[in-house]
A protein has these predicted regions:
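Generic structural signal of hydrophobic/aromatic residues within well-ordered alpha-helices
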Residues: 7-11, 62, 66, 79-82, ...
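Short, hydrophobic/amphipathic alpha-helical patches that form generic packing surfaces
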Residues: 77-85, 134-143, 286-294, 331-337
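Noncatalytic linker/hinge segments flanking ATPase motor cores
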Residues: 75-88, 194-198, 228-233
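Phosphate/adenylate-binding glycine loop and adjacent helical scaffold
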Residues: 49-88, 93-97, 101, 117
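Short, low-complexity, polar/charged sequence segments that are solvent-exposed and flexible
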Residues: 61-64, 175, 207-210
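Charged low-complexity "KEKE/polyampholyte" interaction tracts
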Residues: 1-36, 41, 46-55, 197-345
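Catalytic core of the SET domain in histone-lysine N-methyltransferases
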Residues: 1-23, 84-194
């Protein structure tokens, strides 16, 4: 469309790179595709066009960037035009509206279970059907980190997510799509590291098959070793995954623990590695992992049952995310049980 061409031209004039790209509907909804399937594509949004997350406000139907946003006038005019013609306006915020409509209508017991098991942040319990919440959620779904600051990234944010694509790149001058071979298919990148299906749903409102699934909060005491294992149930990995309290107290605290994985034996390896500083034997660790995996399947299955009863015939992205995770954890549970049998035979 002419609107799209004008936006791309202005983007380039302001220092943006938009090589061989077009926008249209695909399997994942609206996305970015190559114009010429035999050539590579690239989007690079320079830092002068990055919009500070806290500088957007709603004025009537449109988004406005605050005067003290630090953006030059031409850049600000482009960003406002981009949001109002494409990203927020013109049904660009439709998916955010659908997510909020579904989430705010959920029965309180379901929301409370989601929060108790750390599938959502407690701030999501305050979501309302209001313009303020719509904008807050819209920004959260699109925010990138650049030099320690939360920013929105016009043009680059139109690229859809795949867990099996490389991540977007942060350079000194801005953010860009990862290099990829020309194969004619939709341009995709990974939004963030080791996402689980549930953390994708929480952060972006959609579900997708993921490589790993993380455990809910638990505290289990192994009496014969006078050791308590506590997991805080964070739904994404941590750089320092283990916080060992002094071993005399016999408490081992973990922020996040993989319980299901495409590499089906990885959860057991992770737990064995965490407990390698203790005296706990392999058989006890395998039994503990089986207990944790069953607990995680059970909790998700109960939640899914409640959800499906509430949703009747429509299947939400949340239901899909729970189903993905249950399957992934079940596969890993089978692998753990096989390892236990092998070691016992």
């Amino acid at each position: 469309s002419n609107e799209w061409k004008n936006l791309v031209n202005t983007f380039k004039k302001l220092g943006g790179i938009a090589e061989n790209i077009d926008i249209h509907e695909g399997e994942l909804g609206r996305g970015i595709f190559p114009q010429d399937k035999t050539h590579r594509s690239l989007i690079a949004t320079p830092k002068n066009i990055l919009v500070k997350s806290n500088s957007l406000q709603i004025k009537g139907e449109n988004l406005k960037i605050l005067g003290d946003s630090g953006m030059a006038q031409k850049e600000r005019e482009f960003a406002e035009q981009y949001y109002n013609e494409l990203s927020w306006g013109n049904e660009g915020n439709k998916d955010t509206k659908i997510f909020l409509g579904h989430f705010t209508s959920l029965p309180e017991p379901i929301k409370n279970k989601l929060e108790k098991n750390r599938f959502i942040d407690s701030k999501m319990l305050n979501y309302k059907r209001s313009d303020e919440t719509l904008l807050e959620r819209f920004i959260d779904e699109r925010a990138f980190k650049f030099k320690g600051e939360s920013v929105l990234v016009p043009m680059l944010e139109l690229v859809n997510h795949s867990n099996f694509a490389p991540p977007f790149r942060v350079t000194r001058t801005g953010l860009e799509t990862p290099p990829a071979e020309a194969n004619g298919s939709e341009i995709l990148h990974k939004y963030s590291g080791k996402n689980s299906a549930m953390s994708l749903w929480r952060s972006y409102g959609f579900s997708a098959k993921s490589i790993v699934s993380y455990g809910i909060p638990f505290e289990i005491t192994i009496n014969e070793y006078s050791t308590t294992v506590r997991c805080y149930g964070q739904q994404e990995p941590e750089s320092n995954e283990i916080k060992l309290k002094n071993s005399e107290s016999g408490l081992i605290s973990i922020n996040s623990l993989p319980v299901g994985c495409e590499i089906s034996t990885l959860p057991l390896s992770a737990l064995s590695s965490i407990l390698s500083t203790t005296e706990i034997d392999g058989e006890t660790i395998r039994n503990l992992m089986i207990f944790i995996q069953k607990l995680n399947i059970e909790t998700r299955s109960e939640l899914l049952k409640d959800l499906l009863e509430y949703e009747q015939n429509s299947i939400s992205e949340l239901s899909k995310a729970l189903k993905h995770e249950i399957q992934l954890i079940q596969t890993s549970l089978i692998a753990t049980e096989l390892l236990r049998q092998e070691n016992n035979s």
